Amino acid sequence: MNGDGEQPGPGDGAARDELPSMDLVRRTLAEARAAARARGQDPGRGFAAGPAPRRVAGRRRSWSGPGPDTRDPQPLGKLTRDLAKKRGWSGHVAEGTVLGQWSQVVGAQIADHATPTALNEGVLSVTAESTAWATQLRIMQSQLLAKIAAAVGNGVVTSLKITGPASPSWRKGPRHIAGRGPRDTYG
């Protein structure tokens, strides 16, 4: 307010908090619209434009009927598969399925006698409980790959590395260098 008791106008250099509340809102909105126009954007008119015009021709609004619809609730498994596919996690989820659901993928009998240990770059390492089972799994290798491909898709597991039970050995680790030959080990 100035000294005469008049209300300040938008052209006056008065502070914003001296304006009545609706004038302040209108002035702020006008400034925002002007800034949008300066950036080359369409500021729109908000609700002042009225409701959207009614469409006379064209497709009518479809209400959900008694049959299945895309708006119906979806199973959680389908939603997680879609999310994994959208985010690019499908390969990792498939690898986890092979390792986590081994008995459903290959069958209960094989799962009782063989355990997957690692899956690196498409090579699945499987440890059998006996050398006989390791030999049997090597014979069935193509059938196992077909079962795995049917469960999780092609290309997830490209080959199998089947090993028997670990026998006692002096070697440590998967790679080794030849030693100096036989020595007197036991005193």
Swiss-Prot record:
InterPro entries to which the protein is assigned, alphabetical: DciA-like, UPF0232_actinobac
Which stretches does UniProt call biased (Basic and acidic residues)? Answer: 14-30
Q: Where is this region: Disordered?
A: 1-77, 166-187
A Pfam family hit: DciA
Cysteine disulfide partners in this protein = none
User: Which intervals carry biased composition (Gly residues)?
Assistant: 1-12
Output compositional bias ranges, type Low complexity.
31-55
PANTHER family per UniProt: UPF0232 PROTEIN SCO3875
HAMAP family reported in the protein's UniProt record: UPF0232
Record's family?
Answer: Belongs to the UPF0232 family.
Name of protein: UPF0232 protein MUL_0004
